[in-house]
């Protein structure tokens, strides 16, 4: 679900975010959709009054398959590293203690699992998603033996040659931290407006020759979310 801005609106604007940050969260005993909505509204107000003008939007990702490390992920979109640092400094100094009291029993954030990535859009959607929700897939990929970034460029050209679904778009995430081994060679993020569009695109891909041609250059681990 979206919060201060819709991710697709933010990321397909004339000035898309240059950084995306993912903060792991666990639900508490008092967690509910109503309590989450209340916290989102409070958080939006706090951010509006904070030194966070460089935050371009935020949303929440819910995994399609349960993960023991998190129940959901709070996503922050930034226009620059400096803007991100200024906002976090202000938050930590002036707002965090109040927020901790507000969320007690409802949810917990994990500051040991905060992951910042550079963001480069690879392809824009044919039709902008204005629904306020979306689905996505993270692909953590490693080159197979004998392949390299040049083969990824060829694959990207092949992807661009097909309309997989009207709402489909993707980008590449560049970690601004040291990934745990085995570190991916690249992280590819697919996005769609809904599950139906996702299924259309995946069926087209699986029935194409890409999995056995340029798509055979790498092997990926996939993680799916709704937002």
Language-model segments: which ranges?
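Conserved AMP-binding/adenylation subdomain of ANL enzymes
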Residues: 1
